[in-house]
Amino acid sequence: QRRIDFQFGWFLDPIYFGDYPESMRERLGSDLPTFSEKEKEFIRNKIDFIGLNHYTSRLIAHRQNPEDVYFYQVQQVERIEKWNSGEKIGERAASEWLFIVPWGLHKLLNYIAKKYDNPAIYITENGMDEEDDQSATLEQVLNDTTRVGYFKGYLASVAQAIKDGVDVRGYFAWSFLDNFEWAMG
């Protein structure tokens, strides 16, 4: 819960509830700004929809003194790849941080709906990367079964969330065109 408070609550709790999550206040104290009543009123419920970029989910464990970057040290959490039992969260894509976890999106959509009064949600980016294999033939590149499986799984999770009553209004796939913005602005 602490990790999701820092990931989503940091932005959404002030809009919906007028303040940061308690777990953030406990760890960051006066480093977090406070909102006046006028500011709270100005931002409260002033949201038309949530745009959600989602690529992966991670396993998180409590660590008193995590070795990871400062952001995780403050949260006292650490990202882990597998439980002690050896169970992994999902298959890894090309990036070390990206695992294929369709059920994670389903769980997140239901969490957002429950905590934030079922706002309209547009999944503004969802997808995976793959290794850049210059030796692959066109036939091999077009036989992209991992990506097909990724989208089938994630779209099925979105469909299930909609059946659960989550107000998902749109879904956009992460494509090669999205990455032009990094180099070509």
Predicted features by range, described:
Residues 1-185:
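Active-site region of glycoside hydrolase catalytic domains
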